[in-house]
Amino acid sequence: MPSWALFMVTSCLLLAPQNLAQVSSQDVSLLASDSEPLKCFSRTFEDLTCFWDEEEAAPSGTYQLLYAYPREKPRACPLSSQSMPHFGTRYVCQFPDQEEVRLFFPLHLWVKNVFLNQTRTQRVLFVDSVGLPAPPSIIKAMGGSQPGELQISWEEPAPEISDFLRYELRYGPRDPKNSTGPTVIQLIATETCCPALQRPHSASALDQSPCAQPTMPWQDGPKQTSPSREASALTAEGGSCLISGLQPGNSYWLQLRSEPDGISLGGSWGSWSLPVTVDLPGDAVALGLQCFTLDLKNVTCQWQQQDHASSQGFFYHSRARCCPRDRYPIWENCEEEEKTNPGLQTPQFSRCHFKSRNDSIIHILVEVTTAPGTVHSYLGSPFWIHQAVRLPTPNLHWREISSGHLELEWQHPSSWAAQETCYQLRYTGEGHQDWKVLEPPLGARGGTLELRPRSRYRLQLRARLNGPTYQGPWSSWSDPTRVETATETAWISLVTALHLVLGLSAVLGLLLLRWQFPAHYRRLRHALWPSLPDLHRVLGQYLRDTAALSPPKATVSDTCEEVEPSLLEILPKSSERTPLPLCSSQAQMDYRRLQPSCLGTMPLSVCPPMAESGSCCTTHIANHSYLPLSYWQQP
């Protein structure tokens, strides 16, 4: 190219109007709520950009944007144009000098058609109320101190106004299968969780500003939305934020944007930052991580060892603050314990230990490296050393009081925390796999246990601290104590003795009642043992009743004879003229006992019918079983 041609091109470029500002479609959408045709915004409150749209293109120099503060002459703002597809032309003006941008003063702006000498549109605004901040930059995200926590820090493009901005965080799990972008799961809205980053010229903001409670985004469950739909947000007022409730071991994406706080400065939400991804460490509970101390000086941590993988433990101490001062803690190696059987087999647990103190919080991190070389991180819950005191295994002693009734005693492993120690006792029958667990009261040193007689059991005991001063994990179970309960002979002897005592007491009570209260004794005796009736009196009454109900004539039958006998009357001799009495006295008569079966049909006539009234025989035998023997004598 000739030198003169290069000179002309350079001159044309220098003389051409500069494209002073560019307004993106995203900026236009953020200002959609502004109904003014002439729209303005400020990124840092030290600049000002205004624009408007025209449907028809116009020659260069047709329009002019003028501005003026009160009692000042109008000045023109240099314009640049942008072609808008299917719409027209967009005219943009950016104030050239920072001194022309003043806060808290009304600014009068109007658009003038130079050729027609007409005002196209006009507006009065305050620069401090049209803020549209740029998205935060240098966003850093990492796992927090708790499993499922995410710690985010960022820097503001304009640090001078960062104290007058509030921030919004949007995040969600990263889905590698979705090539169009991550699906927004949930957004949280709350107040600040940590204050702004501490700068060299500022005061200790970490100690001055309070911290809000961490949010729980997954408390109500995830809610899937479309990629274009915005959900709720997490609001913060500083350069760091700590959120919780995420799923440990998952990957997340996040974005940030800012807005004037509405108190000192006003405006609209700015655009979202570029997405940042972060991998959260897994929960060390999956490895069975357990840390404890026996002497409040040395801490031992153990976790399950995985096959074909190596692991390493790390720790660091932090002060008790709501917002962490150390954004990027320095992890120290936890000294690994030597294996007792190297090369024989993979141990079940990996162990490491380190020295600690009781003036800071302990954080534990375990890194597991698999055979392909992939590193997986697992984070444990932070703890104080007095919350991880592990007691030695207690000793269990027992003795059988009676059949199936045991008295248990155990020796307290720590006399300095006897009232803060709780126990668990479990037992099972021989040949059974199910354990029954009992929890004695806090601080108990013994108890009783009732088991089935003539059975065999296994008993175990363990202890842990659970008081206001010390806490810790459960100790290991004691060695199984085998118990064989006795038979129920003692119970039978007890019942027999009880019956004897009750019987003797009853006899003594009756004797005492007879001696002290005879009348009550007689009533009690008649109530318990009624007297037998008089048999003679009862029989006599029975005979009288039977005679009254018997017929006047009775028949006597003698089954021993074939011919029925007849009643004979023995008359005296004719020489004896003296009449004999019809019935003599009982003392002068002989009686012959007859069989009752022979008297069934025999008619008896003790008193003849010719006898006078009142001369009936006095020897009336009611049962008709006897007859006078003299009546049967031969004449």
From Swiss-Prot:
Q: Where is this motif: WSXWS motif?
A: 474-478
Q: Which cysteines are joined by disulfide bonds?
A: C40-C50, C77-C93, C193-C323, C194-C241, C291-C301, C334-C352
Q: Which residues form the signal peptide?
A: 1-25
User: Can you say where in the cell this protein is located?
Assistant: Cell membrane; Golgi apparatus; Cell surface
Q: Which GO terms describe its biological process?
A: basophil homeostasis; cellular response to hypoxia; eosinophil homeostasis; monocyte homeostasis; neutrophil homeostasis; positive regulation of lymphocyte proliferation; positive regulation of platelet formation; thrombopoietin-mediated signaling pathway
Complexes and interactors: Homodimer. Interacts with ATXN2L. Interacts with JAK2 and TYK2; these interactions increase MPL localization to the cell membrane. Interacts with THPO. Interacts with SHIP/INPP5D. Interacts with BTK. Interacts with SYK; this interaction negatively regulates THPO-mediated ERK1/2 signaling.
Function (record text): Receptor for thrombopoietin that regulates hematopoietic stem cell renewal, megakaryocyte differentiation, and platelet formation. Upon activation by THPO, induces rapid tyrosine phosphorylation and activation of JAK2, providing docking sites for many signaling proteins such as STAT5, SHIP/INPP5D, GRB2, SOS1 and PI3K. In turn, These signaling cascades lead to the proliferation, survival, and differentiation of megakaryocytes, ultimately leading to increased platelet production.
Against PANTHER family, the record matches this protein to: CYTOKINE RECEPTOR, ERYTHROPOIETIN RECEPTOR
* Name of the protein in its database record: Thrombopoietin receptor
**The organism of origin for this protein:** Homo sapiens (Human)
The gene for this chain is MPL
